[in-house]
Amino acid sequence: DTESFANPGCKDSKGKTTLNINIKTEPFSLHPGLANDSVSGGVIRQTFEGLTRINADGEPEEGMASKIETSKDGKTYTFTIRDGVKWSNGDPVTAQDFEYAWKWALDPNNESQYAYQLYYIKGAEAANTGKGSLDDVAVKAVNDKTLKVELNNPTPYFTELTAFYTYMPINKKIAEKYGVGLFNSTFSVLSF
């Protein structure tokens, strides 16, 4: 199958740019909370951006986050969302988009196979296994620009985890109306 991606920031004289990428099979899902294979993950990594991304040296660096603060005990992370970042429809990317996406993946009704990737977060495993509430999951959008996350234990590689596709944001307003269909990275999927 061939995917077509549009890069809204780089356009030809007709105002369009398309990048065709040949992949071996159709993605299982383009929903960050449902993707469970390398093909889906590859497409998501090209069309969504998490709080962090892994650079060419294999190290995490800021993605949607412009600033990352860690508490002295290593159990609380505060992420500041970059100014000016938008979804492909022009809506701003907010801290609420991350909170919504992570709790969506943890909701046992959604059967996210990779929800366990979020179990580092306080209350996440209990919520996903039905022994706790999603309201008790310690991820909170303090405001549009600030996401606070409390972990069960110090997890020095947590910023690397936030580059994984299960940690990508979802535009709640659009997802609840249409399902996933917006992207917050350089490219958007046009067809596959």
How would you name each of these model-derived features?
Residues L151-F192:
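Gly/Pro-rich hinge or "lid" segments in bacterial periplasmic/extracellular proteins
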Residues K67-Y114, K148:
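Aromatic- and charge-enriched surface segment that lines or borders ligand/interaction sites
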Residues T52, A56, D73, K86, ...:
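Sec-exported extracytoplasmic/periplasmic mature domains
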Residues K72-D73, A141-N143:
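Residue-level recognition of beta-strand termini and adjacent short loop/turns
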Residues N22-K72, S188-F192:
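N-terminal lobe/hinge region of extracytoplasmic solute-binding protein
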